[in-house]
Amino acid sequence: MNKYFAICPRGLEEYLAAELAAVGASELRSTHGGVFFSGDWATCYRANLELRIATRILWHIVKGPYAKEEDIYRLAVRQLWPNHFAVSRTLRVVTTAIKCPLKSLDFVTLRVKDAVCDRFREDRGERPNIETRNPDVSVHVFLSENECTLYLDTSGQPLWQRGLRKASIDAPLKENLAAGILKMTGWQPGEPLVDPMCGSGTFLLEAVQMALDRAPGLDRNFAFERLANFAALEWADIRQAAEARCKPAEPLDIRGYDIDDKAVRATRKNLQEAGFGGVVTVDQADLLDTQPLTEHGIMVANPPYGERIGEQDELAAFYPQLGSALKKHWAGWNCFFFTADLRLPKLVGLRPSRKTPLFNGPLECRLFEIRMVAGSNRKE
């Protein structure tokens, strides 16, 4: 059994652990920003293919104490890197730390790179080339106050890069964060879902994949395919089983709206290119005028955060109108708003039944749940 660490957006660790259990991972242990787990290589392959919330899966190589940079070099140079990947593979080293007393993480990165290359020279007579932008193999170094852990990345490009969304507007949500938010809403396939501010359609694309039981990694490749122990036949079987499980792309009760015609066109293009054209209804509409087509359902939206000059005032004027529209049209619906603007509930004039801290990268946000029961949410 190997040990791994699955990284995810902070606040979604509980949901990631549930996904890991579903693909057969064991010895689950959550921490800030991820989940430690154990499993064989088939579990690692399935995790990369199936997990909707993970950012990447790191394979644990070694952990050891350190006091200075040379301790880290000695730990790294003792590892049998040539057994893990070929010298022809390009290499990158990535270092992150919490409470690390060392002055320069860049120097740590350099020393680990030296250690890996020195080990290759000793064992193979040559060293791998360094590629910082799009490497074949990445060694990840994590430093705590007095311990160093070395990992090999099994994912490659971040797992939120599904290979689906092409057109985007402004700064779209990462797909794994959108998937995690959908999980937090409690939405189930078959239940009506509306995104009234759909942007380039990230929530819609993730919801369709969930509804069709489509593994999010089917349209991409992974770094584990470039490791020396890659079991191609086993991976082919896992991938084929996931493909066979997909449901046919038939119309779903999932709807997207946006006031911006450019966003509507981007969403339609992304759905079409993903093979989901006709599965989701997308129209240009103002949320303030939009009305649901069913008595119950889930609304999920990512309103603007108001980070640019003047937008704060615009949002302060918009939110009371949003509150009025929700009270008028959306009774019976559970409405979820993901935002970094913590003024939203007060200005909307509706009391959230739940507010969950989440992070969009480094930006602290909230997922506000507002249950629209007619006449019961008004603030006095």
What do these predicted regions represent?
Residues 8, 258, 339:
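Short beta-strand/turn micro-motifs composed of small residues
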Residues 173-291, 308, 312-316:
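Conserved S-adenosyl-L-methionine
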Residues 1-137, 380:
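Non-catalytic nucleic-acid substrate-recognition regions in nucleic-acid-modifying enzymes
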